[in-house]
Amino acid sequence: MSGKTIVVLATLDTKGREAQYLREQIEKFGDKALVVDTGVTGAPGTHPDVTREAVAEAGGMPLAKILEHPSREVAAPVMAEGATKIVTRLAAEGKVHGIVAMGGTQGTTLSTKVMRALPYGFPKVMVSTMASGNVAPWVDIRDVTMMFSVTDIMGLNPVMRKILANAAGAVCGMAGVEVTLERREKPLVAITTVGITTQGAMKAAEVLEAAGYETITFHAI
């Protein structure tokens, strides 16, 4: 499609097969996958482009040190910090153009921390077991696209293959869109609104735009 590079963020000790499948699907679209390993305790189930050792080092603690007394409480913040530093740097340098990840509660928490550090408009797709409920803790105010995994992410099956293929298609499609956030020429005014104030907000926007301002509206709840 677009010849872009897509980050695949995954714990390769538990989701190596799924990450490899995502890589293959992304490559079918003519894009390149850059697999970042955020796993800790087990050997990676597929070859990473960015190793868990590199991620841990970027997070401020060597992997060997984490493995002396492995625990989620220690490992998760380090790997999240390391992955965030690596991916945001690559994005700022224009070397990656989208990110897709998959996980349960822990994987979603780690991966969306990385995603929330990326700019608005940068494609972010999170395949998650948690996406059928309240996703506010993971999305917050960022443009993270949450995709429900339907099944647990534990091996490949007909449903999981289709979901991951859809996720690859989604992130590659987003990365191929050439629309960018425009530089602002007019002063920008924020408006908050909710159902019963919609008409008033629309009138306020009309008046402001006629006066030479640009408006951006946020839902108040």
Q: Which residues are covered by each model-predicted region?
A:
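Short gly/pro/ser/thr-enriched loop/turn and capping motifs at secondary-structure boundaries
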Residues: 16, 41-43, 130-135, 153-155
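Glycine-rich phosphate/diphosphate-binding loop of Rossmann-like nucleotide-binding domains
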Residues: 15-27, 34-35, 40-53, 184-221
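Short, acidic/small-residue loops that bind anionic groups at enzyme active sites
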Residues: 98, 110-139, 148, 216-220
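Cap/lid and interdomain-hinge subdomains that line or gate substrate/regulatory clefts
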Residues: 65-68, 134-196
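Conserved active-site and cofactor/substrate-binding residues in soluble primary-metabolism enzymes
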Residues: 14-17, 21, 74-82, 106-109, ...
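N-terminal phosphate-binding or glycine-rich loops at protein starts, especially the Walker A/P-loop
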Residues: 2-44, 98, 107-117, 121-126
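Short glycine-rich or small-residue beta-strand-to-loop segments that form or flank ligand, phosphate
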Residues: 5-11, 66-75, 96-103, 187-194, ...
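Phosphate/nucleotide-donor binding subsite
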Residues: 47-95
